[in-house]
Amino acid sequence: MQKILIVEDDTNINNLLQEALSKAGYSCEQAFSGTEAKLLLNMQEHSYALVLLDLMLPGITGEAVLEEIRKKGNLPVIVLTAKDSLDEKVKVLTSGADDYITKPFEIREVMF
């Protein structure tokens, strides 16, 4: 079973993603801050198939988490954010995100 790390400080969104992905057959771990995500990634750096990453997080930002992930390898990262400007999208994708989904989103947008 593939494991997905959900990094989202909004409890409702985090739980919604976890529920939908679990029903689709994925194993999920949740982080509610950039600091927590970084800790989990350091403990389990090769066990995740994908990271769903919010940009606006308490503590360490999503951008910093993405930078840390890219230093270690090619773990796929899909950014989920309320930041919807073209400049922000280009910046994040250039920094190494594999996809960029703007909130609010439909759950089907993150199903793969």
Question: What are the residue ranges of the model-derived segments?
Answer:
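N-terminal/domain-start alpha-helical segments
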Residues: 1-112
